C-alpha cells in the first residue's frame, strides 16, 4: 500500500462556486484522506496516496487548470521530462513526465504519464548517467528497472489534460496512445538527481527511439509559493500558456 504524501496545486479560482467545484472533484477520488482549498491564495492542498496526475485530471475536469507547486516533504521530490530524440518528433519532442516522490526511507513512488506513442508495453528504467548527448543511447547502464507501462489508451482530449505531449493533428485518429503508471522504487531521492529515466519498447535494452530525460530535484510541499518568475517577469499562468504551446499539458 502506498504511503500518504502531501501535494500543493495552484488553481485559478474566483469565487465560492469555483471552490465547490474543485471540492466535488476531489471527493470523487478514492485515496485522498484530506484536502484544503484556499480561495484567497488560489492554492489546493491534498494529502493521500492518489497519483498527482490523477488529481490534476480531476481538477481540470471542472474547467479549471492546475499546476503542481510542490510534492512531499522538503528534499523529497524530483521530476523528469521525457523527450523523443527522433527527428520526426522535432516539432513536439515532449512525450512524457515522471513525478517522483519519497514516501519513506528507500521508498519512492513514480507517477509516470506518457502521451502520443504507438500502442504497446514500454519498459521504463533509471539509468546511471544523465548524459543525453546521444539521446537514450548515452545514458549508461541500468541503475534501477521500473515496472512495465501499458500504453493502450487512445489519444484524446482527456489524455492530453493530464499528460505531456500530444498527437500531431496530421496523425490518423487511433494510431497514437497514452498511458499512466504508479510505480515503486526502493531508492532515495538523493540517489537519483542528475541521473536519467528512459522509456524503451525493448525490455532491458536501450534503442535510438527510446524516450529519455534527466532527473532534477523539485519543490516539496510549501517550498514554492512563486507567482511571478524573477527571471522572465511572467506569471505562472503565462509560463503555463507557453508550455502548452510546446506540448506540455501538466
Swiss-Prot record:
Domain HMA: 4-67
Localisation: Cytoplasm
Keyword Disulfide bond in annotation: yes
Pfam families on file: HMA
Cofactor comment text: Binds 2 copper ions per subunit.
Superkingdom of the source species: Eukaryota
Cofactor dependency: Cu(2+)
Keywords: Chaperone, Copper, Cytoplasm, Disulfide bond, Metal-binding
GO molecular function, one term: metal ion binding
InterPro entries membership: HMA_dom (IPR006121), HMA_dom_sf (IPR036163), SOD-like_Cu/Zn_dom_sf (IPR036423)
Principal localisation: cytoplasm
Residues holding Cu cation 2: 229, 231
Residue numbers binding Cu cation 1: 15, 18
Endoplasmic reticulum found in the keyword field: no
Gene Ontology cellular component list: cytosol; mitochondrial inner membrane; nucleus; protein folding chaperone complex; superoxide dismutase complex
GO-annotated biological processes: copper ion transport; removal of superoxide radicals
Family under the similarity heading: Belongs to the CCS1 family.
Reported function: Copper chaperone for superoxide dismutase 1 (SOD1). Binds copper ions and delivers them specifically to SOD1.
Protein name: Superoxide dismutase 1 copper chaperone
Organism field: Debaryomyces hansenii (strain ATCC 36239 / CBS 767 / BCRC 21394 / JCM 1990 / NBRC 0083 / IGC 2968) (Yeast)
This protein's encoding gene: CCS1
Amino acid at each position: 500500500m502506498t504511503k500518504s504524501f502531501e501535494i500543493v496545486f495552484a488553481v485559478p479560482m474566483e469565487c465560492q462556486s469555483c471552490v465547490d467545484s474543485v471540492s466535488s472533484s476531489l471527493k470523487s477520488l478514492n485515496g485522498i484522506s484530506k484536502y484544503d482549498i484556499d480561495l484567497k491564495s488560489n492554492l489546493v492542498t491534498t494529502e493521500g496516496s492518489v497519483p498527482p496526475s490523477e488529481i490534476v485530471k480531476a481538477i481540470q475536469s471542472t474547467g479549471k487548470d492546475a499546476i503542481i507547486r510542490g510534492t512531499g516533504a522538503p528534499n523529497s521530490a524530483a521530476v523528469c521530462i521525457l523527450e523523443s530524440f527522433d527527428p520526426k518528433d522535432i516539432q513536439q519532442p515532449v512525450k512524457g513526465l515522471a513525478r517522483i516522490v519519497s514516501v519513506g526511507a528507500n521508498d519512492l513512488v513514480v507517477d509516470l504519464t506518457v502521451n502520443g506513442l504507438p500502442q504497446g508495453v514500454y519498459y521504463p528504467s533509471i539509468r546511471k548517467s544523465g548524459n543525453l548527448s546521444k539521446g537514450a543511447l548515452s545514458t549508461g547502464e541500468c541503475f534501477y528497472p521500473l515496472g512495465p507501462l501499458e500504453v493502450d489508451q487512445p489519444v484524446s482530449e482527456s489524455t492530453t489534460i493530464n499528460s505531456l505531449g500530444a498527437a500531431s493533428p496530421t496523425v490518423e485518429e487511433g494510431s497514437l496512445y497514452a498511458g499512466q503508471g504508479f510505480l515503486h522504487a526502493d531508492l532515495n531521492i538523493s540517489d537519483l538527481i542528475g541521473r536519467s529515466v528512459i522509456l524503451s519498447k525493448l525490455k532491458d535494452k536501450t534503442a535510438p527511439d527510446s524516450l529519455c530525460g534527466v532527473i532534477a530535484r523539485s519543490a516539496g510541499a510549501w517550498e514554492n509559493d512563486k507567482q511571478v518568475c524573477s527571471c522572465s517577469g511572467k506569471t505562472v499562468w503565462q509560463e503555463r500558456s507557453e508550455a502548452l504551446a510546446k506540448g506540455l499539458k501538466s
